[in-house]
Amino acid sequence: MTEQRFTHLDDSGRAQMVDVTDKDITQRAATAQARVRMQPSTLQMILAGEHPKGDVLATARIAGIQAAKKTWDLIPLCHPLLLTGITVTIEPEADDALCVQATCKLKGTTGVEMEALTAASVACLTLYDMCKAVDRCMVIESVCLLEKSGGRSGTFRRER
């Protein structure tokens, strides 16, 4: 078994941006997920399009897309990436939650896991922000990477 190490630390333990100069360009994709739990009445208001702030779901999707593009600005050691695809979906779950899934794609030398995780997280934060006036008990939960493909480490799929 090969020794695992933190790639963002140099031999002296100092933070560094990983050098991907010599890595092969491959097709890469990642999908992340997060949930916002809320009062059933809040979810019904959103789904019926009756929220006073307008289309909550469209705003959250756009926020997630923007967040994926700005990940390198938010997470200090992330590379600026030329993403070729970003999809954010938001679906109701039971009577008290919205499930956000974000998928990011590119052809490049580094993965897009952080971009997908950031997109899902910020979409949930936007849902919270837009709905906090009517429901302060919301909970953002279960932020996780569902799958990734491409690159040296191959494919990962979370067991559901």
Curated annotation (Swiss-Prot):
EC number(s) per entry: 4.6.1.17
Active site: D129
Single Gene Ontology BP annotation: Mo-molybdopterin cofactor biosynthetic process
Keyword Lyase included in the entry's annotation: yes
Domain of life: Bacteria
Keyword Magnesium among record annotations: no
Catalysed reactions, semicolon-separated: (8S)-3',8-cyclo-7,8-dihydroguanosine 5'-triphosphate = cyclic pyranopterin phosphate + diphosphate
Gene3D superfamilies the record matches: Molybdopterin cofactor biosynthesis C (MoaC) domain
Enzyme class: lyase
NCBIfam families, A to Z: moaC, PRK09364.1
Free-text function comment from the UniProt entry: Catalyzes the conversion of (8S)-3',8-cyclo-7,8-dihydroguanosine 5'-triphosphate to cyclic pyranopterin monophosphate (cPMP).
Entry similarity comment: Belongs to the MoaC family.
Official protein name in the record: Cyclic pyranopterin monophosphate synthase
Gene, per the UniProt record: moaC
